[in-house]
Amino acid sequence: MAIITLVGEKLAKPGVEFIFYGPAEPCKTCKLAGVCVGNLEPGRRYKILRVRSMPSHSCPLHEGKVRVVEVVEPSIEVAIEPRLAVVGSVITLKLEDCPDLDKRDLFKPEGLFDGDSVKIIEITGEVECNGKTYKIAKVMRKKE
């Protein structure tokens, strides 16, 4: 289900993904904070589905203007234990440690947290780290 929020005019395009890091200081007193940052969860990745055809709103953070958009949490690729890699299953995510910085996005992907409940959508490959082979799974977070 889509979430309604506000994003800067320059980002307001279908398909654009962003990470919400939490509200900035000026947001705390803004009258639009409820719809803008109130519907988003800090640390999560969002993808813009649709830009609503409504007037833009003033914002001191986004070069003056924000637009109303519909967003969803997209699927994210993550390295998981091979024994857990069953398409369609729901697992509790255990993010593995990997010292290889080039593989960080697979082992600690932004938008997912250790302990998240996720559904495995697809297995897209394999990755090695510390002499161990992991499956690369495309997952969707299951909300409580």
From Swiss-Prot:
Top-level taxon of origin? Archaea
Report the record's disulfide bonds.
Answer: none
Please give the InterPro entries that the UniProt record associates with this protein: UPF0179 (IPR005369)
Q: Which family does it belong to?
A: Belongs to the UPF0179 family.
What is the protein's given name?
A: UPF0179 protein TK0790
Q: Which organism is it from?
A: Thermococcus kodakarensis (strain ATCC BAA-918 / JCM 12380 / KOD1) (Pyrococcus kodakaraensis (strain KOD1))
